[in-house]
Amino acid sequence: MVKLRLKRCGRKQRAVYRIVAIDVRSRREGRDLQKVGFYDPIKSQTYLNVPAILDFLEKGAQPTETVYDILKRAEVFKEFRLNQTKFN
């Protein structure tokens, strides 16, 4: 199973995170399938590759709680629901 989760980058006391699609069994810093975004909590900056995220969500990827909150704030799930209604 694939999850959308945060991968820690940056230096000490100055963490930034990449949002990655990664296999559930691999560790946090393990090899990811694809980088789909970036999150800087200090500057409150977020970059999301929305088409890639929607593609992984349609294939059944599960976001972690923190990634879910980031995606919800960016209103990605509205687009996801619109895509779901078009196909059904």
UniProtKB/Swiss-Prot annotation:
**What are the protein's GO molecular function terms?**
structural constituent of ribosome
Does Kinase count among this protein's keywords? Answer: no
What does UniProt give as GO cellular component? Answer: chloroplast; mitochondrion; small ribosomal subunit
Which UniProt keywords are given for this protein, alphabetically ordered? Chloroplast, Plastid, Ribonucleoprotein, Ribosomal protein
Instruction: Give GO BP annotations, semicolon-separated.
Output: mitochondrial translation
Keyword presence, Chloroplast: yes
Describe the subunit structure: Component of the chloroplast small ribosomal subunit (SSU). Mature 70S chloroplast ribosomes of higher plants consist of a small (30S) and a large (50S) subunit. The 30S small subunit contains 1 molecule of ribosomal RNA (16S rRNA) and 24 different proteins. The 50S large subunit contains 3 rRNA molecules (23S, 5S and 4.5S rRNA) and 33 different proteins.
Similarity annotation = Belongs to the bacterial ribosomal protein bS16 family.
What name appears for this protein in its UniProt entry? Small ribosomal subunit protein bS16c
Q: Which organism does this sequence originate in?
A: Spinacia oleracea (Spinach)
Designated gene of the protein: rps16
